[in-house]
């Protein structure tokens, strides 16, 4: 996790796109062009338990998740936000969904309203990655 952490902490203002690019750069060379073929992924439904699997998952599916989240948030009433907000991300994986919401809050200058993010995930290593992604 150290190598990933070093790449991520070097970013001035972390975004989901930064995470995707970092994971692509850290994907094992045998899977750079086809990260979805990494055996531990099991077509993206496996409980991930190692760093290569985490990197390959984001390299393979991160862009798709980011687009889906942005699409879901495009009609969100950002102008109606006032008061504190908490995100509860159940089954957060590496924190992709929460990161996309945070990116949207940054774009709408609403980050000051976000008071807490609660991450819930059965994979310890994925949860650790989510914590890195959302605290840097």
Protein language model regions, located:
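Conserved SAM/SAH-binding beta-strand->alpha-helix loop
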Residues: 123
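N-terminal auxiliary segments of SAM/dcSAM-dependent transferases
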Residues: 1-40
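Active-site catalytic pocket residues across diverse enzymes, especially alpha/beta-hydrolases
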Residues: 76-77, 105-109, 134
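Short beta-strand element of Class I
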Residues: 115-118
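Class I SAM-dependent methyltransferase Rossmann-like catalytic core
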Residues: 45-79
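Conserved SAM-binding loop of SAM-dependent methyltransferases across substrates and taxa
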Residues: 94-111
């Amino acid at each position: 996790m150290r190598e990933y952490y070093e790449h991520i902490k070097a970013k001035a203002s972390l975004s989901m796109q930064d995470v995707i690019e970092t994971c692509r750069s850290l994907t094992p060379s045998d899977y750079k062009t086809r990260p979805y073929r990494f055996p531990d992924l099991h077509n993206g439904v496996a409980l991930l338990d190692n760093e290569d699997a985490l990197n390959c998952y984001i390299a393979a599916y991160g862009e798709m998740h980011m687009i889906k989240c942005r699409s879901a948030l495009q009609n969100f009433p950002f102008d109606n936000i006032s008061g504190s907000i908490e995100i509860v991300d159940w089954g957060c994986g590496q924190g992709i969904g929460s990161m996309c919401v945070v990116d949207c809050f940054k774009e709408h200058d609403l980050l000051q309203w976000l008071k807490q993010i609660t991450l819930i995930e059965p994979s310890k290593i994925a949860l650790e990655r989510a914590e890195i992604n959302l605290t840097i």
